[in-house]
C-alpha cells in the first residue's frame, strides 16, 4: 500500500533529529514539546520546523501531566496554526487525554488539524467518543494504533470521513503486524485500505504533492 515513510517523535527531540538527518527520505519528524515549558516550548517548535525540517507536533497529556484542553496547549496550537502543521495528541487515558477534552481543544482552534492518536485506546466508551467528537469537529482526525476493534476502523472511514482515519503502529509498543492486521480485517475494500494505510497520512502531512 505504498508505505514508504514513517512519522517519528522522541523525547529528547535530539534523538528524533538524529534519525531524520540519517534517513531524510524515510522519516518525518514530529517535534515533541512539553507545554509546561511555556515560551521555551514554542520557540523549540519554530526552531525544529523552520530550521530542522520537522513537519508536525506531538503532544502527550498523559506523559507530561496536563489535561488536553488546558490553556497550556493554546500557545502550542497557535504555533501549529502559524506554521500550518498538524498536532498529534495521545488519546484515551483519564483524566488527561479523554476524547471530549481533546474535542474542546479542537473547538478552540478550528484552523488546526488535530489527530487523536490511538482513537481512544482500549476502552469502548472512549473509542465511541472519539468517533462522536470527530463527527462534530471537522479538524479532528483519527489514528488507530492500540485501538483493538477492527470494525471501528471501518465505521470511522464511513461515518467520520474517508480522509480522516489513518494507520499507525505506536512502535515499539505495539507489533506492527498486529496493527496492520486490524486494518486488513476491518472490512474495507482495496481503495479504502490504501487510503487508511498511506494516502490519508500523506495528504495530511503534504508529501502526496511530490
Segments from the language model and where they lie:
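Active-site gating loops and adjacent loop-to-helix segments of metal-dependent hydrolytic enzymes
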Residues: 24, 110-112, 197
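Mid-to-C-terminal alpha-helical segments outside catalytic/metal-binding sites
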Residues: 1-4, 162-164, 177-210
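Alpha-helical elements of Rossmann-like donor-binding domains used by nucleotide-donor carbohydrate transfer enzymes
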Residues: 15-18, 44-47, 75, 101-104, ...
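Active-site beta-loop-alpha junctions enriched in small/polar residues
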Residues: 11, 32-36, 60-64, 90-94, ...
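Active-site gating/metal-coordination segments in enzymes
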Residues: 4-5, 12-88, 136, 140
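Catalytic pocket-lining loop regions of alpha/beta-barrel enzymes
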Residues: 55, 69-166
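Conserved active-site loop/cleft motifs that coordinate metal ions or position small ligands
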Residues: 9, 143, 164-169, 174, ...
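Short, charged, surface-exposed secondary-structure boundary motifs
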Residues: 39-42, 66-68, 124-127, 152-153, ...
Amino acid at each position: 500500500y505504498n508505505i514508504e515513510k514513517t512519522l517519528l517523535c522522541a523525547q529528547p527531540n535530539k534523538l528524533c533529529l538524529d534519525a531524520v538527518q540519517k534517513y531524510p527520505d524515510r522519516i518525518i519528524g514530529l517535534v515533541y514539546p512539553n507545554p509546561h515549558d511555556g515560551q521555551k516550548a514554542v520557540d523549540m517548535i519554530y526552531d525544529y520546523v523552520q530550521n530542522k525540517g520537522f513537519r508536525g507536533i506531538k503532544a502527550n497529556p498523559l506523559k507530561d501531566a496536563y489535561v488536553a484542553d488546558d490553556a497550556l496547549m493554546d500557545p502550542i496550537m497557535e504555533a501549529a496554526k502559524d506554521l500550518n502543521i498538524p498536532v498529534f495528541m495521545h488519546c484515551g487515558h483519564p483524566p488527561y487525554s479523554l476524547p471530549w477534552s481533546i474535542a474542546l481543544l479542537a473547538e478552540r482552534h478550528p484552523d488546526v488539524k488535530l489527530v487523536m492518536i490511538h482513537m481512544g485506546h482500549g476502552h469502548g466508551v472512549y473509542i465511541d467518543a472519539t468517533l462522536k467528537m470527530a463527527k462534530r469537529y471537522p479538524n479532528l482526525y483519527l489514528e488507530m494504533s492500540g485501538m483493538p476493534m477492527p470494525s471501528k476502523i471501518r465505521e470511522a472511514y464511513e461515518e467520520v470521513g474517508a480522509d480522516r482515519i489513518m494507520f499507525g503502529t505506536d512502535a515499539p509498543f505495539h507489533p506492527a503486524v498486529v496493527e496492520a492486521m486490524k486494518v486488513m480485517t476491518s472490512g474495507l475494500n482495496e481503495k479504502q485500505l490504501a487510503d487508511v494505510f498511506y494516502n490519508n497520512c500523506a495528504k495530511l502531512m503534504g508529501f502526496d504533492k511530490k
